[in-house]
UniProtKB/Swiss-Prot annotation:
Record's function text: Master enzyme that delivers sulfur to a number of partners involved in Fe-S cluster assembly, tRNA modification or cofactor biosynthesis. Catalyzes the removal of elemental sulfur atoms from cysteine to produce alanine. Functions as a sulfur delivery protein for Fe-S cluster synthesis onto IscU, an Fe-S scaffold assembly protein, as well as other S acceptor proteins.
GO cellular component terms attached to this protein's record: L-cysteine desulfurase complex
Organism: Vibrio cholerae serotype O1 (strain ATCC 39315 / El Tor Inaba N16961)
Signal peptide span: none
Pathway(s): Cofactor biosynthesis; iron-sulfur cluster biosynthesis
Name of encoding gene: iscS
Chain positions recorded as [2Fe-2S] cluster binding sites: C328
Family matches, as PROSITE patterns: AA_TRANSFER_CLASS_5
One Gene Ontology molecular-function label: cysteine desulfurase activity
Name of the featured protein: Cysteine desulfurase IscS
EC code(s) of this entry: 2.8.1.7
Annotated catalytic residues: C328
């Protein structure tokens, strides 16, 4: 067993060996290394053909038209292009946007930027299970609302939003609907026709593809217009200029092809591992599972261990590669803003760990993880005076702490 055990698949996945093997063929003199935009010779034609194939593979996973796929450097850029692109193009129709408080920073920070530019953003509070209430979303809509941006699967707590219902609502109100699907593509089925989504952000490295490549799905019927954020040679139908990285695009295409073929297999494997981990820790005292347990992907388990400091638990679990919150924010000592939005207090939010598993995780690794978690939590609680007070029946919320 390789230590530390990797249980941080929501941060990134290892590249599937089949994907890596394919990518290598598009880099060197022996392979297809040409620029897809070179129209005058075979090197360019072959590269363009490889890009077209990848575009088809990505579109197939979404039940989309290949012409609706725009390549970007990743989901962060896709979020920026979608949100700023819509805001700047449709600003004559209105300047109001709706999103939720539990979105990824790539969405929230983009919204903050638009607020500085004079747009008005409504941030919806999720329910305590992490899901957005459709009635609250509808109530927030106004005549000048131009965009709704709600993620499909949350990166910290793994809950799955009812995208089809939100899409129906947005379509009936003629509001553009953007979805960040970085955490759901390849994990759950996505059908853009059924879901009535206008824009979808995609990432390759969350689906066993390479880092540094992503895509934005841009609906053609009804046509969605965007203002480009990256200017230059007019690549990607003018949406996103820049030479296309053939090897990365081929990697993303292959990763999405495999994801489509093995979707059910991967899902069942993750579910088995998640249930195994849950069964191994659910009888522990003062343990909370964060987020709805039914409407969530099985690849994620976010757990709060009360009376244990999250940072010290991470240190104690040095043989497990896990995180507290998302990789993008886990470097900060602030409690997770996602868990705070669910109504968890600072202490509980601070004591949470995200376990995320995937294609290459084994049952033996989960069993080893359970053992480590139980020992570490018991050891840390044994050192905690708060744990002693809790065991003595003291309600810690009513204690008046003296400030010396």
């Amino acid at each position: 067993m390789k230590l530390p055990i990797y249980l941080d698949y929501s941060a990134t996945c290892p590249v599937d060996p089949r994907v890596a093997e394919k990518m290598v063929q598009y880099m060197t003199m022996d392979g297809t290394f040409g620029n897809p935009a070179s129209r005058s010779h075979r090197y360019g034609w072959q590269a363009e053909e490889a890009v077209d194939t990848a575009r088809e593979q990505i579109a197939a996973l979404l039940n989309a038209d290949p012409r609706e796929i725009v390549f970007t450097s990743g989901a962060t850029e896709s979020d920026n292009l979608a949100i700023k692109g819509v805001a700047h193009f449709y600003n004559k129709q209105g300047k109001h946007i709706i999103t939720s408080k539990t979105e990824h920073k790539a969405v929230l920070d983009t919204m903050r930027q638009l607020e500085r530019e004079g747009f008005e953003v409504t941030y919806l509070d999720p329910e305590s299970n992490g899901l957005v209430d459709l009635a609250k979303l509808e109530a927030a809509m106004r005549d000048d609302t131009i965009l709704v941006s709600i993620m499909h699967v949350n990166n910290e707590i793994g809950v799955v939003q009812d995208i089809a219902a939100i899409g129906e609502l947005c379509r009936s109100r003629k509001v553009v609907f953007h979805v960040d699907a970085a955490q759901s593509a390849g994990k759950v089925a996505i059908d853009v026709q059924e879901m009535k989504v206008d824009l979808i952000s995609l990432s390759a490295h969350k689906a066993y593809g390479p880092k540094g490549i992503g895509a934005l799905y841009v609906r053609r019927k009804p046509r969605i217009r965007l203002e480009a954020q990256m200017h230059g040679g007019g690549h990607e139908r003018g949406f996103r200029s820049g030479t296309l990285p053939t090897h990365q695009i081929v990697g993303m295409g292959e990763a999405f092809r495999i994801a489509k073929e093995e979707l059910q297999q991967d899902y069942d494997h993750a579910l088995k591992l998640r249930n195994r981990l849950l069964d191994g820790i659910k009888d522990m005292e003062a343990v909370t599972i964060n987020g709805d347990l039914d409407q969530r992907v099985p690849h994620n388990l976010n757990v709060s261990f009360a009376f244990v400091e999250g940072e010290s638990l991470l240190m104690a679990l040095k043989d497990l590669a896990v995180s507290s919150g998302s990789a993008c924010t886990s470097a900060s000592l602030e409690p997770s803003y996602v868990l705070r939005a669910l109504g968890l207090n600072d202490e509980l939010a601070h004591s949470s760990i995200r376990f995320s598993f995937g294609r290459f995780t084994t049952e033996a690794e989960i069993d080893y993880a359970i053992e480590l978690i139980r020992v570490a939590v018991d050891k840390l609680r044994a050192m905690s005076p708060l744990w002693d007070m809790y065991k003595d029946g003291v309600d810690l919320n009513t204690v008046e702490w003296a400030h010396h």
